[in-house]
Amino acid sequence: MFANTTNAPRIGVFYDGNFLLHASNYYNYIHPQRRRLSLNGLHDFISQRVAEEEGIDPKRCRVCEAHYFRGRLNAADAAQRGSQLYHDRVFDDILMSEGVHTHYLPLRNIYGRKEERGTDVWLALEVLEMALRGKIDVAVLVVADTDYVPLVRKLIAMGVRVMLISWEFEYTNDEGARIVTRTSHELLNLAHYPVLMQEVIDCGIEQ
């Protein structure tokens, strides 16, 4: 725990959009609760958890920056996927209502498949810029990939505390394939405040 008796920490939350969507889909379609993740609830939880870890009054702990990064289809491709455009707009409205800044890159056509490229680099650059400008004291990363390890190491060297919001789960999909989601153990070990959200959520449900 960091003892902070004077200044309220400035919290920045940074979402890997694909990871967040994957986790939200799991809770909406697979988990017994059958409910999507609430961004408002997640931000409230983050504020409370940072306050607890930093040893300050929760009332003085608020998310001041929130950014969402994801690759997405262009309008023409999305229009060919039924209600994709509508659902994208609905989620954009949710992000906007929570004050989350969106950062989109077009999906690339790689060997006939639409794939995401460059969003992890963009996320890392955005976090580093805010850290260098002194706009955040705590970087909350909603990510899972080992690719983010250099970012976390750099933030630690700069004196920025890192909270890692992670999920781990597995299930069998409709095609019978086993889907496994794991967070990089190196990320979990590096972060000042690693949070295993599946345990937090399941514990809250049991209570």
Role assignments for model-derived ranges:
Residues 1-115, 161, 168:
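Domain-level signal for Mg2+-assisted phosphodiester chemistry and nucleotide/NA-binding surfaces
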Residues 89-207:
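Nuclease catalytic cores that cleave nucleic-acid phosphodiester bonds
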